[in-house]
Amino acid sequence: TLGAVTGKVALGSKRETERAIASAQAAFPDWAATSPLTRARVMFRFKELIEKNMEELMVLVSSEHGKVLSDAKGSIQRGLEVVEFACGIPHLLKGEFSDSVSAGMDVYSMRQPLGVCAGITPFNFPAMVPMWMFPVAIACGNTFVLKPSEKDPSCPMRLAELMIEAGAPPGVLNVLNGDKESVDTLLTDPRVQAISFVGSTPIARYVFATASLNGKRVQSMGAVSYTHLRAH
């Protein structure tokens, strides 16, 4: 409310975005080959670090977004629930097997990581929405490039630091502060295999159309609380 500067971060360009993607791509083979149990241990440690640093994260959200501390804490706790879900990844990654579906034929399925995934998140939930995305993707053996809102980037950046402290190797999680140029690079770069987006409906449509046109798996969610009026 006083208009004070809370911090400064570098605004990434296409070049920085490509470097983040390259970092994630380089880290992918070793991380994908890491056992699900080891990845789960990283998630358990990440969960503990979030709980340990809850007060700091609350202040970061409140100071940049403007949420009251109780609201900031609630949003972090909702994101933490997804981290807790990701801790169970050894069980969640189990495949399926069907014996003798036909003469001399069995059928089985396996769940395998895709590669480099990216998440584009909005201003209103700088902790919760990023934690909807990168913990599960990373627990599954993917590497991740997170592009949070440039309006309140400090909490996502701190979460990345905690992820590294938890044991995630370099390049597994990359945080990029950028604008539309960075977004377009993520949507079109062939090294990015999947995109997750939360934000306004017009941008959600743009993200879905652009990313799918470039052959990516897309999860694109626009605004909530729709009102649908129909003539009777």
Label for each model-derived stretch:
Residues 1, 22, 220-222:
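Short, flexible turn/loop "capping" segments at secondary-structure junctions
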Residues 85, 95-230:
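Rossmann-like NAD(P) dinucleotide-binding subdomain of oxidoreductase/dehydrogenase enzymes
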